[in-house]
Amino acid sequence: MSATANLKKDYQERIVPALMKQFGYTSVMQVPVLKKIVINQGLGMATGDKKIIDVAVSELTAITGQKAVPTVSKKDISNFKLRKKMPIGVMVTLRREQMYEFLERLVRIALPRIRDFKGIESKLDGRGNYTLGINEQIIFPEINIDAITKILGMNITFVTSAQSDEEGYALLKEFGLPFKNAKKQN
């Protein structure tokens, strides 16, 4: 059975009943669900070197298994030598099977490879969504350490249908995200 089937099955069989009991939901449709995962790399240094965008696109494509899209600037900023529609970042939006696959690889393989890893911060955005900042792309096994020219970080945003931070936290905790300050549940 694939990682996707494992996480989906785990969500339906274990996570949904646990969250229904914890929050007192009357319908399965009230239970929060993970809608999408957005991976974003802001590459400000790309204004000087255009090859950085190509490298970032290929690395993010290798990490996620889906083609990465360059993001462009919206306006001119002369202090940063930035022109309108100049590529300054890379992003990927994962949904459905690829989302669950990436989540499983992130939790089981990539996060434990971070040096001195003690867990991730437990602050959500107020609407049940969570953004995780990663400083180096080399924690992913798909990246060849010898081939990289520059260490690049990324932001990984987990978008949920949760109405509150408490619901979003509970959902992500059940999916296996290793939060640092694990809140005590009653």
From Swiss-Prot:
Which terms under GO biological process does the entry name? Answer: translation
Molecular function in Gene Ontology: rRNA binding; structural constituent of ribosome; tRNA binding
Give a yes or no for keyword Ribosomal protein in this entry.
yes
Gene3D superfamilies found in the cross-reference section: 3.30.1440.10
| Record's keyword terms, sorted | Ribonucleoprotein, Ribosomal protein, RNA-binding, rRNA-binding, tRNA-binding
GO cellular component terms, alphabetically, are: ribonucleoprotein complex; ribosome
Q: Name one Pfam family in it.
A: Ribosomal_L5
What family classification does the UniProt entry report for this protein? Belongs to the universal ribosomal protein uL5 family.
Primary role: This is one of the proteins that bind and probably mediate the attachment of the 5S RNA into the large ribosomal subunit, where it forms part of the central protuberance. In the 70S ribosome it contacts protein S13 of the 30S subunit (bridge B1b), connecting the 2 subunits; this bridge is implicated in subunit movement. Contacts the P site tRNA; the 5S rRNA and some of its associated proteins might help stabilize positioning of ribosome-bound tRNAs.
Report quaternary structure and partners. Answer: Part of the 50S ribosomal subunit; part of the 5S rRNA/L5/L18/L25 subcomplex. Contacts the 5S rRNA and the P site tRNA. Forms a bridge to the 30S subunit in the 70S ribosome.
Q: What is this protein called?
A: Large ribosomal subunit protein uL5
Q: Which organism is it from?
A: Porphyromonas gingivalis (strain ATCC BAA-308 / W83)
